[in-house]
Amino acid sequence: MVKILAVEDEALVRILIVETLADAGHSVVEAPDGESALAIVKETPDLDLIVTDVRMSKMDGFSLARFAREIRPDLPVLFMTGYMGSDVPANIPGAKVLQKPFDPDDLLAAIDVMLAARP
């Protein structure tokens, strides 16, 4: 079973993401912000993927990804954002961006592509 960390500061959006992933058979750990998510990355060595909002309080998604990659350089990251032009920084290779709003099927398809690309 794939274990995914879902990071989203808007509770209703986070619930939708968690339910979508769980219904698809994934194990899901959730966090309301980047700081909480980073603590989970440190404590959970078997994470397969991070799905994170870009703009959040305390720590944005790009910072979360950079710090998480210091711990787990191979950990894939899928960014979600409602802001056009949010490109993945060059120092986060292999990460992808999913534009909000998105259909749950689009989220699952993006995750499938990222998981299939893992070594």
Feature roles, as predicted:
Residues 8:
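Conserved acidic carboxylate
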Residues 18, 102-115:
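C-terminal output helix
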Residues 80-81:
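Hydrophobic/aromatic residues positioned on beta-strands within the core alpha/beta folds
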